[in-house]
């Protein structure tokens, strides 16, 4: 038996998927609750990581070290960068994950780990610095399982768009338009979050295929929470994930 792991930072980001699991049992690893169940014939592990890179990396490592994990889906909400073409409620699928903070600040600006020659992960001649390409086969498999106009449990599919592109993982969410424009220009990214690159790094270490999907809850740089919609973002993201099974 091999498992597909589904991770989200907070319970509200994956509650609908949890409710869809059959034959649920619970285990505890390093103080974390791991939920084991079945979804459309697939053996599933679910875990809420908590916010941030360390929580995310620790959670992914706990699962991979204790269960035979064949693939991992990281999901939740995220902030879209201006000029990404995404709006609140849309879905972003990561083509790659990028650490947005790791590197060095010089008098000439930010430089990546590759620029200073320090890899995060090495597999022989293959070296990973700030960027981790996500699994193309799992990405294609996910896209291929989405019908052109699939019905959703809570409304019409045409209410949002799905777009793939680079994600940036940050330690501090972007709260100014200047910073949002800077990160968008530097990485050509569509979406930011606080966990994805850390999970992608762990998956690279263990050679586990990974897919990341996020619902857009806000526009990065916009701190007026009255304009955010966490519920819509998480609902749409979960509906898309469920369509893949």
Name what the model sees in each region.
Residues 45-49, 164-168, 213:
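Active-site-proximal beta-strand elements of phosphoester/diester hydrolases
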Residues 170-212, 221:
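A C-terminal functional module that forms or caps the active site or interfaces directly
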Residues 82-146, 159-186:
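Mid-sequence, gly/pro-rich, charge-dense loop/helix-turn segments that line enzyme active sites
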Residues 1-61, 66-67:
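N-terminal short beta-loop-beta anion/metal-coordinating cradle
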Residues 70-73:
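Structural motif
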Residues 154-157:
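Glycine-biased, low-complexity coil/linker segments
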Residues 220-245:
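His/Asp/Glu-rich mid-to-C-terminal helical/loop segments that flank catalytic regions of hydrolases
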